Amino acid sequence: MIRIALIGSRELEQKPEYQQDIKLCYKVCYRLAELGVTMTSGLCALGMDGIAQKAYSQAILDGKAVLEQMEVYVKDEYEIKRSPLPNKHVARVRNPELIQATLELASSVHPAWHRCNEWARGMHSRNCHQVLGYDLQSPVDAVITWTPNGNIQGGTSTALRLAIKKGIPVFNLGVYDKTMVLAAIKELLLLKGVIHSAKALPPIYCLR
């Protein structure tokens, strides 16, 4: 089964004008869980990360997904302890044997690495696992994200830039034309054999 990174900006849940976007992102994540897609994410309480964690956890409670579909990465154990998200125990601390490799990867795509302190660099390096897996040799099949107006910004930008660099398709639900993005996601799922008909995706196309 395919793996998709579900990541994005905290701003999604910090401004009231994005309520419809929150609902859409949740529906997309829940449907992906139902379809057996494995998610990768970063345990951030706000934004697409948190929405995905909640949607997948609910799908598991509903008997429509399994815990093994959640692949979550964090910088350190403290992130797990302080997280309010369900099923936070599935999170893995970044691979200790590959910390230097993740730092090098993150620095290669970050526009202002010299301005990042140790904590920020750790968070950015964690993002590399979201895209390339625990061993950095297992890239996701795609990234579905939400950033304001589709801009590449914030902590998510490292993962997005890395995905683009590696030729991994990125679908951004923060853009105005969400129907186009949803259609592109559908095409990916058809191509990967996750679905065999557009009729398999009605919940995703309910924008309200």
Feature-to-residue mapping (PLM):
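Low-complexity, Gly/Ser/Thr/Pro-rich intrinsically disordered linker/tail segments
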Residues: 199-207
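Acidic/glycine-enriched connector segments
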Residues: 2-199
